[in-house]
Amino acid sequence: MSYQPQTEAATSRFLNVEEAGKTLRIHFNDCGQGDETVVLLHGSGPGATGWANFSRNIDPLVKAGYRVILLDCPGWGKSDSIVNSGSRSDLNARILKSVVDQLDIAKIHLLGNSMGGHSSVAFTLNWPERVGKLVLMGGGTGGMSLFTPMPTEGIKRLNQLYRQPTIENLKLMMDIFVFDTSDLTDALFEARLNNMLSRRDHLENFVKSLEANPKQFPDFGPRLAEIKAQTLIVWGRNDRFVPMDAGLRLLSGIAGSELHIFRDCGHWAQWEHADAFNQLVLNFLARA
């Protein structure tokens, strides 16, 4: 039987999660079947979703025999919104813990991009026994950069887009989000803008969260040595959102880690270099 590509609609699922005395309706996509599960965690950009973030990576993982879970973190996609005054990454980790508990999944491989990488580290620090392998892309620890003034130009444009969600500001952000902008089609811009504007509560609550706590993503640097999971760190050489030296901090702090840097690549390695990225990840997951 020939392989049938996964679709967002057919794999869409919801679960209720208790958080700080409230019930949140959390959306995720559940793709494929397999003894091992890979959870994909998206970044913090306006309009981001698990499916949109990893659209070029889902089928290769499923075809390789993995069950793939794509979570919409609270405040993104079809999940409920929230004003968060603590660590956003620890919040996402708690939500993920509840989801995998309800799905009766004992252990997961984690693959996170940007905020998703930071949230993957938070999950691993809190529940190390639940993590198989770790893939961190363009994120994983906060803290300052030795070479790049903070906040970076990418983060400045991201925050501006949250406050003024226009097509002009979206294009300004995406113009430095990836290295080669020729793949940024009008259809992609329109889909991302529609995602943003369909959930203005997400945009407003992200801004309120920043006002309540500007440091949504704490510095995990001092705790990286606690991570024992085999870890693949992936970075774009031309990332203008999270500087490449953050990847070097992860490499230095996590004993069982290795670093792969893509040249001619911005903040979206899994999309910009999808074929090479997919093979890199599959080889890493398959190793003993």
UniProtKB/Swiss-Prot annotation:
InterPro entries: AB_hydrolase_1 (IPR000073), AB_hydrolase_fold (IPR029058), Epox_hydrolase-like (IPR000639), MhpC_alpha/beta_hydrolase (IPR023791). It comes from the Bacteria. It catalyses: (2Z,4E)-2-hydroxy-6-oxonona-2,4-dienedioate + H2O = (2Z)-2-hydroxypenta-2,4-dienoate + succinate + H(+); (2Z,4E,7E)-2-hydroxy-6-oxonona-2,4,7-trienedioate + H2O = (2Z)-2-hydroxypenta-2,4-dienoate + fumarate + H(+). The active site is at 267 (proton acceptor). Keywords: Aromatic hydrocarbons catabolism, Hydrolase. The record marks 192 as: Catalytic role in ketonization of the dienol substrate (substrate destabilization). Disulfide bonds: none annotated. Pathway: Aromatic compound metabolism; 3-phenylpropanoate degradation. GO terms for biological process: 3-phenylpropionate catabolic process. The record marks 114 as: Transition state stabilizer. Its EC number is 3.7.1.14. Belongs to the AB hydrolase superfamily. MhpC family. Homodimer. HAMAP family: MhpC. Catalyzes the cleavage of the C5-C6 bond of 2-hydroxy-6-oxononadienedioate and 2-hydroxy-6-oxononatrienedioate, a dienol ring fission product of the bacterial meta-cleavage pathway for degradation of phenylpropionic acid. PANTHER family: ALPHA_BETA-HYDROLASES SUPERFAMILY PROTEIN, HYDROLASE. This is 2-hydroxy-6-oxononadienedioate/2-hydroxy-6-oxononatrienedioate hydrolase. It comes from Escherichia coli O81 (strain ED1a).
